Amino acid sequence: MLRVLLVDDQALFRDIAKNMFSSVEEFEVIAEAEDGADAVDAYADMKPDLVLMDVQMPRVNGLEATKQILDSNPDARVVITSMRSEPEYRRLALDTGALGFIAKRDLSISALKDVLGGAIPVAA
């Protein structure tokens, strides 16, 4: 079972993602964070197997938080999610070292498994 840290400033999105993860046995949400600063702290405390990271958040954005997490653990698995899915935006997300990018409108267990399995770095 993969232990997941959900990072998004929108409680509604976190609730939707938790509901999606609760429908399968392969994933367990172990922590949530509302911004990148809290995500970095939660990652250090919880050591999740996967971080599902939003981009646009207060204090520290998801791109910077991803870089900080990967600086502390280069093997960390971070998947970026965003409402924006333009090619240049996806490239910025992947340039952080994230494992992949999934547009929020396309977020599903199947898309996440594709990214985690290395089949595709971008599900958008």
Residue ranges and their predicted role:
Residues 46-52:
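Active-site beta3 strand of CheY-like receiver
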Residues 2-13, 17-21:
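Conserved acidic segment of CheY-like receiver
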Residues 64, 85-102, 106-114:
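Alpha4 helix (beta4-alpha4-beta5 surface) of REC/receiver domains from two-component response regulators
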Residues 57:
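Receiver (REC) domain active-site loop signature in two-component systems and cognate sites
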Residues 7-8, 33, 51:
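Conserved sequence signature across two-component system core domains
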Residues 80-81:
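Hydrophobic/aromatic residues positioned on beta-strands within the core alpha/beta folds
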